[in-house]
Amino acid sequence: LNYCMRFYERQFVTRSKVNKDILVRFEEQLDAYFQGGRPQSEGLPTVKYFADRMNLSPNYFGDLVKKETGRTAQEYIQGKLIEVAKQEILGSSRSVSEIAYRLGFQYPQHFTRIFKKSVGCTPTGYRDLQV
């Protein structure tokens, strides 16, 4: 079992360039997901969704992202989500509820909770701070 674990871990080191390429593709897919309006039709992006696009298993994809970025794939996706949310909050006059729905949230309260946990203030508070 130890041998298997060492082999599994070593592949992340020996395939560093390939892994970087996968991360670049992941970032492109993530951008396309939000720019293409997919959140409204498909909901919040998932690790499985992007792993499928990369032709990798969700577990392997998650391990790869963690090794290369130091963040889990879910944290990485959520970071991008918050980044897009900040742009929407500052770049539009839409209500927080509209932004939440555009980003794929079923409930605006869930969006507000995640935003506040990540940024330290509510979306409305963030908008007020930037004005």
What are these regions (language model features)?
Residues 22-74, 92-101:
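DNA-binding recognition helix and immediately preceding turn/loop
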Residues 64, 81, 114:
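Residues within the DNA-recognition helix of helix-turn-helix
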Residues 57, 106-107:
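Helix-turn-helix DNA-binding motif, specifically the short coil turn and the N-cap/start of the second
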Residues 113-131:
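…primarily DNA-binding HTH/wHTH and HhH modules…
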Residues 1-31:
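An amphipathic alpha-helical interaction segment
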Residues 61, 110-111, 115:
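Short hydrophobic/aromatic patch on the recognition helix
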